[in-house]
Amino acid sequence: MVKRLVVTAGEPAGIGPDLVLALSKEHWPHQLVVCADKKMLAQRAEQLGINVTLLDYDASTAPSPQQAGTLVVEHIDMPSTCVAGQLNEENGHYVLKTLERAALGCMKSEFDAIVTGPVHKGVINRAGVAFSGHTEFFAELSNTPLVVMMLATEGLRVALVTTHIPLAYVSKAVTAERLQKIIDILHRDLVEKFAIAEPKIYVCGLNPHAGEDGCLGREEIETITPTLEKIRQEKGIHLLGPLPADTIFNEKYLNDADAVLGMYHDQVLPVLKYKGFGQSVNITLGLPFIRTSVDHGTALDLAGTGQANTGSFRTALQHAIELVEKKQ
């Protein structure tokens, strides 16, 4: 059965529109609907020398596979002109409107998944909206109390206990309650969305050497280890850890792990991006819909040049399609 996926082009001055237009050259097995300003896409296509037919989205028609050389567009009006590579605060609210339209469409089953292009947090905040990222935006919009940020590339999945908070706040944020909820969501979605019957989750410690018996910090002793033991006993989830972050990423562990759970953003993401930059995908777990995204930013210096690497966007789209097809 043909499904309908919605794609947000992201920050209009960045490479998001370039990526969407580049992939319009190809055939895809499901319908792709792009939430963006149609005129902006037409202008960028001309700038890039891409010959594409922009079609108006009609929700009343049945979805059909994406045909090469075409792009179905749900037009969201952009209030100000856009120059590739130049941020414009007047378009900050426009970006959020594209995200809102896509998410609400998924929540009412109009769309089967969201694939998001990169946004610029700074320009949205300067437009007067407190915005810390897609993950938090979709969680609030869908009234989801807690979501899990996971990134994946070939041979490695990493998830986070905390996301976009200052490093100084991480220790207090890693509570037994939060850790248990994060593991519940991660385990459930590995089973339900990734079709892994008995997931093996490997858990990082917070401190160097996982605290080294309390000499380098007591979070492992007081919070992480007791919580993992409780979850193992009560729910039978396969958990290994806490393990030192500087040793968990070796073949001995990774060959057996379905996911690695890190305590904070820069503990695990540098490893994943080193392993698969340009070929990795951001997946939000715990939402009432499937959401994948690129693993990079807006790359303003590349916008409109035709030099943007489509690898991560392609991976995000392929992952979304795989997850949608597993639901069938």
Swiss-Prot record:
Q: Biological process GO annotation list?
A: pyridoxal phosphate biosynthetic process; pyridoxine biosynthetic process
Highest taxon listed in the record's lineage = Bacteria
Catalytic reaction list: 4-(phosphooxy)-L-threonine + NAD(+) = 3-amino-2-oxopropyl phosphate + CO2 + NADH
* List of residues binding a divalent metal cation: 164, 209, 265
EC numbers for this chain: 1.1.1.262
Free-text cofactor note:
Binds 1 divalent metal cation per subunit. Can use ions such as Zn(2+), Mg(2+) or Co(2+).
Positions with a binding annotation for substrate:
134-135, 273, 282, 291
Gene3D superfamilies registered for this protein in UniProt: Isopropylmalate Dehydrogenase
GO MF term list? 4-hydroxythreonine-4-phosphate dehydrogenase activity; cobalt ion binding; magnesium ion binding; NAD binding; zinc ion binding
Q: In which pathway does it act?
A: Cofactor biosynthesis; pyridoxine 5'-phosphate biosynthesis; pyridoxine 5'-phosphate from D-erythrose 4-phosphate: step 4/5
- Keywords linked to the UniProt accession: Cobalt, Cytoplasm, Magnesium, Metal-binding, NAD, NADP, Oxidoreductase, Pyridoxine biosynthesis, Zinc
Q: Which cofactor does it need?
A: Zn(2+); Mg(2+); Co(2+)
Q: Where, per UniProt, does this protein localize? A: Cytoplasm
Q: Which InterPro entries match?
A: PdxA (IPR037510), PdxA_fam (IPR005255)
One family name in Pfam for this protein:
PdxA
Database matches in PANTHER family: 4-HYDROXYTHREONINE-4-PHOSPHATE DEHYDROGENASE (PTHR30004:SF5)
Protein name stated in the entry: 4-hydroxythreonine-4-phosphate dehydrogenase
Please report the organism this UniProt entry assigns to the protein.
Vibrio vulnificus (strain YJ016)
